[in-house]
């Protein structure tokens, strides 16, 4: 009975498509109709008629399998733009956190089993980036709204029924929504200082352009916010678009900079003060790459180790640091655990290594999705204090080698053991390494 019903529905869809195509073809200047039938849905789609040339979103989301409406929603049989786009999830961005469960969820997609790393949506919603709970707790505590720095509120309400990773985690947050009776600085903080998290819309200006939700990090934007791809329907002159219709885990530091390192907060006034020393956009092609990176990345008087300005942020910060590990934290310090010693070891201990024993290992899947490095059974890779395998840092020929996730470039990782380093056993946090290993941009 079910098979017969499916045949009837398929025949009806084909008949409807034929009618639409005939009507479309009678209008002058229309592009030829382009039809696909994605294997995951087995439903005809006409979206590529207008969006012919658009980039495939990623190798793990092939259009032949997913099509367009699986992720975007909308009406895949409509050839009128307004009708086709009606009912789309999140408008142009199905990765927005308000709709991501509908667009990207499902046990086989991004809201599945934590054991297989498929619980991306749950983890992101609880992450310190999404909740902004640390900053909110600091401000509320400073102005007498709560007795300590334990987080009680976030940008949105979130619940964790089972704290599994860290004893520093909290079980839930309520939504931060100051009223007219709250201290004025708390109200100003709410109005002026909550636009740098994945729920918030970015400032529509150069250097700040980005998307929201998962696409905040995974959809790359140029500093000018202009589209450089091949979809004829997307403007090349209107800022506010990703550089291409793609998602990636090969994320360069420039993407992180759309939120981070764009200025500082004026705490007495509770306003964001933008940097005035950023290079002009026109200097991108003409300025020495190293000089530009130092100028754009570092604020004056900041100390940074050599690796921090040669590598990208994702080469040190793991997915579970940035996207969350499933627990709800009160501060960034509670969520962050990668230190210099993770890869470089100490005077008394080398970095911890673990073997890849199964091709279904999460680390192998991460390597396949990234595409800049590969893993096989038997490889020895660095493992964090929380048991997370860093597949891009691998033991090879008596040497620890790191592969950059954004470019594929490799570096030999020097170990503290056997070096001239004079670190103290009780001073292992990265800030102590910075005291000697720094590249400082002097104030003008």
Which ranges hold each PLM region?
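Active-site-surrounding "flap" and adjacent substrate/cofactor-binding loops of secreted or lumenal enzymes
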Residues: 68-70, 76
């Amino acid at each position: 009975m079910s098979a017969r019903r499916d045949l009837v529905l398929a025949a009806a869809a084909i008949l409807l498509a034929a009618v639409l195509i005939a009507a479309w073809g009678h209008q002058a200047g229309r592009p030829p109709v382009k039809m696909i039938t994605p294997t995951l849905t087995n439903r005809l789609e006409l979206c590529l008629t207008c969006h012919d040339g658009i980039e495939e979103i990623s190798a793990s989301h092939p259009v032949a399998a997913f099509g367009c409406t699986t992720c975007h929603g909308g009406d895949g049989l409509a050839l009128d733009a307004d009708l086709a786009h009606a009912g789309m999830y999140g408008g142009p961005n199905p990765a927005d956190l308000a709709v991501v469960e509908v667009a990207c969820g499902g046990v086989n997609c991004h809201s599945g089993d934590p054991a297989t790393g498929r619980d991306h949506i749950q983890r992101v919603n609880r992450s310190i980036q999404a909740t902004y709970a640390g900053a909110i707790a600091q401000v509320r505590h400073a102005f007498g709204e709560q007795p300590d720095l334990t987080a009680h509120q976030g940008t949105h309400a979130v619940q964790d029924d089972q704290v599994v990773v860290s004893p520093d985690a909290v079980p839930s947050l309520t939504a931060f929504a100051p009223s007219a009776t709250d201290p004025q600085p708390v109200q100003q903080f709410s109005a002026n200082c909550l636009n740098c998290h994945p729920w918030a819309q970015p400032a529509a200006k150069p250097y700040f352009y980005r998307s929201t939700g998962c696409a905040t990090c995974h959809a790359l934007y140029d500093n000018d916010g202009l589209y450089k791809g091949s979809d004829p329907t997307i403007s090349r002159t209107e800022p506010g678009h990703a550089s291409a219709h793609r998602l990636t885990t090969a994320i360069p530091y420039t993407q992180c900079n759309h939120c981070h390192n764009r200025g500082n907060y004026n705490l007495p006034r509770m306003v964001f003060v933008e940097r005035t020393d950023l290079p002009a956009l026109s200097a991108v092609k003409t300025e020495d790459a190293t000089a530009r990176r130092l100028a754009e990345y570092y604020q004056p008087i900041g100390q940074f180790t050599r690796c921090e300005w040669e590598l990208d942020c994702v080469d040190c910060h793991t997915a579970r640091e940035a996207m969350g590990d499933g627990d709800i934290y009160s501060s960034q310090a509670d969520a962050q655990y990668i230190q210099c010693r993770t890869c470089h070891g100490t005077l008394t201990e080398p970095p911890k290594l673990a073997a890849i024993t199964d091709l279904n290992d999460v680390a192998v899947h991460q390597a396949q999705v990234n595409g800049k490095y590969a893993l096989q059974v038997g490889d020895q890779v660095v493992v964090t204090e929380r048991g997370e395998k860093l597949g891009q840092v691998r033991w090879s020929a008596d040497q620890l080698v790191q592969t950059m996730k954004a470019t594929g470039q490799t570096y030999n990782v020097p170990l503290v053991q056997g070096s001239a380093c004079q670190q103290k056993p009780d001073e292992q946090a990265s800030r102590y390494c910075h005291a000697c290993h720094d590249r400082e941009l002097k104030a003008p």
